[in-house]
């Protein structure tokens, strides 16, 4: 395994590596529904208006969002760089009670990706609210995305309702697609009726926007996405990991203890891109594109396919600076392809 890999994001960073030179102003802002996220518009540069991206009234400094499970609770990365450069981030998936997760080894690097079966390890919603979010607040001034998981409708609604009361939380991301836990979560994401049921239940107990995170391990993700929209979802996050495994040829056993796990990384980017493209044609709510993104070019492709913002997952585990670097590279990459406004390219690949 590469020396850059981190299991569970228990990372000790060198503060001397922190650098904060990023594009200023409104150059890379994005709107997601009704949630405004970003600096005051007075900070805009002369080219800021030309580079803004809007979708409803939600606003981000840029479309780059570290994905849940690959960025810890954010403060770990704050020792590396100023995480306020991010659009926002989705913190580690949270359940009602603490979970120790699956046996180890539960994460392994393989060509073009990573296989993991963490098992939703987390301290539980009360500990996240009382301990993790206050610590994050000292280094991150923006609202974040709370990723919630559950093993029953009651658990989903309980966790979501508690995060709904948190000022630091701007969006609640409902994970109905986690492939790592036996007899939980995944069942809600495999049928239209089950996905709609959890969506409607969570929507009934919160006022904050909810984004439903969908699994690609289904026969018709477009129908499930549409069912979530009809049930009241404010947006969608897709895709979660594909199912996969690798076998150690020396031991002749699977490389992770749980045998199978979620496969993520650059190899799944074409699958994720196609899924975003297909779902965009079927729904009117915003999409956060996820899956194999590792460059500014990938971000632009995702947005052309229909994503309003882009989450970056496995790449964070391989290169912890990747989100910061992509944000830095976006202006020059946009110029390279003759893109003047990010808002103009959302869904642009559907026009041909």
Which residues make up each language-model segment?
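N-terminal capping/small domains of soluble enzymes
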Residues: 2-15, 20, 49-144, 149-151, ...
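Alpha-helix-loop-beta-strand connector modules within alpha/beta enzyme cores
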Residues: 125-139, 190-210, 256-285, 326-338
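Glycine-rich beta-to-alpha transition loops that act as phosphate-gripper elements at the mouths
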Residues: 71, 147-150, 214-220, 269, ...
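Catalytic cores of alpha/beta
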Residues: 76-77, 158-163, 219-231, 281-282, ...
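Conserved, mostly hydrophobic/aromatic
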Residues: 66, 89, 128, 146, ...
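Glycine/Thr-rich beta-alpha phosphate-binding loop at enzyme active sites
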Residues: 114, 178-193, 224-285
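Short beta-strand/loop segments at the ligand-binding rim of alpha/beta enzyme cores
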Residues: 61-65, 140-145, 205-215, 281-290
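Alpha/beta catalytic cores of nucleotide-metabolism and tRNA/nucleoside-modifying enzymes
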Residues: 2-18, 48, 263-283, 294-352
């Amino acid at each position: 395994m590469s020396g850059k890999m981190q299991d569970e994001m228990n990372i000790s960073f060198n503060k001397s590596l922190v650098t904060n030179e990023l594009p200023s102003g409104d150059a890379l802002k994005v709107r997601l529904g009704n949630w405004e996220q970003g600096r005051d518009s007075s900070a805009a540069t002369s080219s800021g208006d030309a580079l803004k991206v809007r979708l409803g009234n939600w606003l981000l400094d840029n479309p780059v969002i570290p994905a849940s499970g690959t960025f810890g609770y954010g403060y770990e990365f704050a020792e590396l760089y100023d995480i306020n450069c991010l659009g926002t981030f989705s913190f580690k998936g949270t359940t009602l009670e603490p979970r120790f997760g699956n046996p180890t080894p539960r994460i392994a690097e393989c060509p073009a990706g990573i296989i993991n079966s963490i098992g939703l390890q987390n301290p539980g919603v009360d500990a996240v609210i009382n301990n993790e979010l206050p610590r994050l607040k000292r280094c991150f001034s923006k609202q974040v995305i709370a990723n919630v998981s559950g093993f029953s409708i009651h658990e989903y609604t309980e966790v979501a309702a508690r995060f709904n009361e948190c000022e630091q939380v701007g969006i609640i991301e409902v994970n109905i697609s986690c492939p790592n836990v036996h007899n939980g979560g995944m069942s809600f994401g495999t049928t239209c009726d089950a996905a709609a049921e959890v969506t409607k239940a969570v929507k009934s107990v919160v006022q904050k926007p909810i984004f439903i995170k969908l699994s690609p391990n289904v026969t018709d993700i477009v129908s499930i996405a549409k069912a979530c929209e009809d049930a009241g979802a404010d947006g969608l996050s897709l895709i979660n990991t594909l199912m996969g495994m690798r076998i150690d040829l020396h031991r002749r056993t699977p490389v992770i203890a749980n045998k199978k796990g979620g496969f993520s990384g650059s190899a799944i980017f074409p699958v994720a891109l196609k899924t975003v493209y297909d779902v965009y044609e079927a729904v009117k709510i915003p999409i956060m594109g996820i899956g194999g993104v590792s460059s500014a070019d990938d971000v632009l492709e995702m947005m052309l396919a229909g994503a309003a913002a882009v989450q970056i997952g496995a790449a964070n585990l391989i290169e912890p600076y990747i989100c910061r670097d992509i944000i830095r590279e976006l202006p020059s990459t946009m110029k390279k392809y003759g893109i003047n406004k990010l808002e103009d390219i959302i869904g642009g690949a559907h026009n041909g």
